[in-house]
Amino acid sequence: MKLKLTDKLLISEKSRPLVVAEISANHCGIKKRFLKHILIAKKSGADLVKIQTYEEKDISINLKNLNKNYNLKNNYRIYKKTKTPFSWHKDAFKFAKKN
């Protein structure tokens, strides 16, 4: 059996293992840094990049009154700063094909 993943990547039972890089919140919500991570993954030998896409409203709620006794952080604000929005996908694919 053979499976064509991209124009340049065909895999089969005899193929070497694929190297998959993951980009999550390590770009700190900066699109330019996100795109740079794609390039770094390629230069490091990754065959594919897995993008962990989320937006703050999808995984958290914006709690206004956190209990100060528990030293809680507002995860909504943290996710908002580090999100990988779906709107970045189109540019990411263009960038990856170009580079």
Put a short name on every predicted segment.
Residues 22, 41:
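Conserved, mostly hydrophobic/aromatic
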Residues 17, 72-75, 97:
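Structural/interface elements that position substrates and couple domains in central-metabolism enzymes
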Residues 44-84:
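Glycine-rich, proline-tolerant flexible connector loops at the mouths of alpha/beta enzymes
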Residues 27-35, 77-90:
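Aromatic- and glycine-enriched glycan-recognition loops and surfaces
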Residues 36-40, 91-94:
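Alpha-helical scaffolding segments of alpha/beta enzyme cores, especially the outer helices
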Residues 42-43, 97:
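Non-catalytic positions within long, well-ordered alpha-helices that form the structural scaffold/packing
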Residues 1-20:
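N-terminal amphipathic alpha-helix/helix-capping segment at the start of soluble metabolic enzymes
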Residues 87-99:
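A structural motif corresponding to the C-terminal end of an alpha-helix
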